[in-house]
Swiss-Prot record:
SUPFAM superfamilies: Nudix (SSF55811). This is Nudix hydrolase 11. Its EC number is 3.6.1.-. Coenzyme A diphosphatase which mediates the cleavage of CoA into 3',5'-ADP from CoA and 4'-phosphopantetheine. Can use malonyl-CoA, hexanoyl-CoA, lauroyl-CoA, myristoyl-CoA and palmitoyl-CoA as substrates, but not isobutyryl-CoA or propionyl-CoA. Gene3D superfamilies: Nucleoside Triphosphate Pyrophosphohydrolase. Mg(2+) binds at residues 90, 94. It comes from Arabidopsis thaliana. GO terms for biological process: coenzyme A biosynthetic process; malonyl-CoA catabolic process; nucleoside phosphate metabolic process. One of its GO terms (molecular function) is guanosine-3',5'-bis(diphosphate) 3'-diphosphatase activity. Belongs to the Nudix hydrolase family. PCD1 subfamily. InterPro entries: CoAse, NUDIX_hydrolase-like_dom_sf, NUDIX_hydrolase_dom. Expressed in roots, stems and leaves. The chain crosses the membrane at residues 186-204. Keywords: Hydrolase, Magnesium, Manganese, Membrane, Metal-binding, Peroxisome, Transmembrane, Transmembrane helix.
Amino acid sequence: MSSTTTDSTELQNLIKLFQNCQTHPRQHFPAKSSAVLVCLYQEQREDKNELRVILTKRSTTLSSHPGEVALPGGKRDQEDKDDIATALREAREEIGLDPSLVTIISVLEPFVNKKGMSVAPVIGFLHDKKAFKQLPNPAEVEEIFDVPLEMFLKDRNRRAEEREHEGERYLLQYFDYYSEDKERSFIIWALTAGILIRVASIVYQRLPEFQERKPSFWNQPN
C-alpha cells in the first residue's frame, strides 16, 4: 500500500474519531484569545505506522516561557476570522509550515491557563512530511522536533508535580522525551502536555495509564 493511500486512510479515521468532539466556531473571542496547531502526521517506525506530533522549543530570548516546549501557535490577531486562521498563521510564522500542506480535522474546546488566556487546540493532519521545509523563526523558535502522540497516555518517562491554585490541588504532568541519538532531551509539561493528553485520549480511545487530575480552571467557560 502506498504512503499516500495509508495517509488518506489515517486521515479518514481521525476525522471519524474527532466528529463527536467538534465544537462550533467561536463567534465572540475573549480579550485573551489564542490558538495552537496540533499538527499530526504518520510515519513508518519499526514496521508500524506511528502518529507523531510537531512541537517547538521556544527561544530562550522570549519574555514569556523562554526555552519551554510548546505547540506552534499564539495570540489571535484582529484579522484572524477564527481559531483555525490563528493557528495556521502562527505555524507559518514560527516554523514555516505552509497551510496548504495541512488538512484541518477539528477544533477542540478551548483550555484556559492560569492567567486567563483562552487556548483553542486546532487539530490538523500533515499529508507529506517531506514537503514541510522547516524554517524556524529565530526570534521565537530555537528548535523544531516531533514526538509520538501515544507517549502522552503512557506512564513511561513521566512524572507529576502537585500544585495549588485558589484552594484547588491539581497535578501538572511532565513528559521527558529523548532524541533517537540520545543527545537531546525535551520536557513537555503543563498546558501543552494537557492538550496532548486530551488529543491522544481521543485518537487512541482510552484513558492515560496514570492519574491526570488536571486543574479545573483549564476548562472554564469563556
